[in-house]
Design a protein with these regions (language model features):
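N-terminal binding-site loop/beta-alpha segment at the start of enzyme catalytic domains
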Residues: 2-98, 156
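Beta/alpha (TIM)-barrel catalytic core signal, keyed to glycine-rich beta->alpha loops juxtaposed to Asp/Glu
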Residues: 3, 12-15, 138-329
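Conserved beta-strand positions in the central sheet of alpha/beta enzyme cores
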Residues: 29, 68-70, 131-134, 164, ...
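Active-site mouth loops of central-metabolism enzymes
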Residues: 38-51, 103-112, 136-142
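Short, acidic/polar
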Residues: 47-61, 110-125, 144, 148, ...
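Acidic (Asp/Glu)-rich catalytic clusters
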Residues: 85-95, 119-127, 153-155, 177-182
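A short, structured active-site edge motif that brings together acidic residues
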Residues: 95-108, 132-136, 191-194
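Active-site groove signature of glycoside hydrolases
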Residues: 125-143
Length: 329
């Protein structure tokens, strides 16, 4: 991790501790869902990207100072995990250089599947240890207590380092935390949707509960499905490349977010950064060290842009201004 720490000196943010574990991560990681194309249930939803391009994206993230990667069983039934492994090896990174997080898919399963599924995760990650293993969502045939006990068994067996959840409500997160506490382990994270365009966790108790319990929030979709980049505001014709569902969703969002995106552009001009970088910086800054985030990337410049969001600091006034403009979301 020394190389990463040296790179972090060029950034404006320190490494953050994942919950109450000893795992140190950059405030921005790289989400790997876009690497799912070609496999499993989610495969058809994403274009197939060549391994060469995936290698370049991961290398760009690493060179920008990012030290952790978030993948999942659901992301192509191992395609994303295996692609990440190949990319890390191509970049010359060892297990000690990076932090890898992945997830167990619980739908139509019980906690008894957890010790079996982990063997596939280990196989696909091929030598890169699982620093964080999460229950991907709350729908399951088992209780959170049963799931956490199965996860704790994996920690005891040395197969994972820490346990997290994703898309859990405040109450379900509290139950997971309590179950792990009985095993002498912390609940490290709750991975949920959060951005300037979706601040529901501030209103439904999830963020307050996470802060109370010392659980890190991992924010996914931090750019509002691309709306906060401003590209759809400048060129609405880009929507024609999207499905009917996405066009319907993004079209309404374009009008509602116009004022917010204009402010992101104005602030970005001050720092010579993009609206997306301002939006990411706000996510990792507004609540102190409570929230980290995982924007995805399919192109080198996107990974570079995400890493570059850690190279400047928004002022308190700018954070408050963006808070005010997005408070209705």
């Amino acid at each position: 991790m020394e190389g990463i720490k040296r790179m972090m000196t060029q950034l404006q943010f320190n490494l953050r501790t994942l919950g109450k574990t000893d795992i140190q991560i950059t405030p921005i990681g790289l989400g790997m869902m876009e690497f799912a194309g070609g496999g499993g249930l989610m495969g058809p939803a994403f274009p197939v990207i060549s391994q060469e391009k995936k290698n370049a994206v991961v290398k760009a993230a690493l060179e920008g100072g990012i030290n952790w990667f978030d993948t999942a069983e659901l992301y192509g039934a191992g395609v994303s995990e295996a692609s990440l492994t190949k990319a890390l090896k191509a970049a010359g990174k060892t297990n000690d250089d990076v932090v890898v997080a992945t997830k167990w898919w619980p739908l139509f399963r019980t906690a008894r599947n957890i010790p079996h599924s982990i063997e596939d995760r280990i196989r696909f990650l091929d030598g890169y240890s699982i620093a964080l293993y999460m229950v991907h969502q709350p729908l399951s045939f088992s209780s959170p207590e049963a799931e956490m006990n199965a996860m704790a068994d994996l920690v005891d067996a040395g197969k994972i380092r820490s346990v997290g959840v994703s898309n859990f409500s405040a109450e379900r997160m509290r139950r997971a935390h309590r179950a792990l506490q009985k095993r002498g382990l912390p609940l490290a994270v709750n991975q949920v949707r959060y951005s300037l365009l979706d601040r529901s966790i501030e209103k439904n108790g999830v963020l307050d509960t996470a802060k109370e319990l010392g659980v890190t929030i991992i924010a996914y979709t931090p750019l509002g499905s691309g709306l906060l980049t401003g590209k759809y505001h400048k060129n609405p014709d880009l929507l024609q490349n999207k499905s009917f569902f996405w066009r319907l969703r993004l079209n309404g969002g374009i009008q509602k977010s116009r004022s917010l995106v204009k402010t992101l552009e104005e602030i970005g001009n001050k720092y010579n950064v993009t609206p997306a970088q301002v939006a990411l910086n706000w996510v990792i800054s507004f609540h102190g060290e409570s929230i980290v985030t995982i924007p995805g990337a399919t192109k080198v410049h996107q990974a570079q842009e995400s890493a570059g969001a850690m190279t400047f600091r928004l002022s308190d006034e700018e954070l408050t201004q963006l808070d005010r403009l997005s408070s209705s979301y």
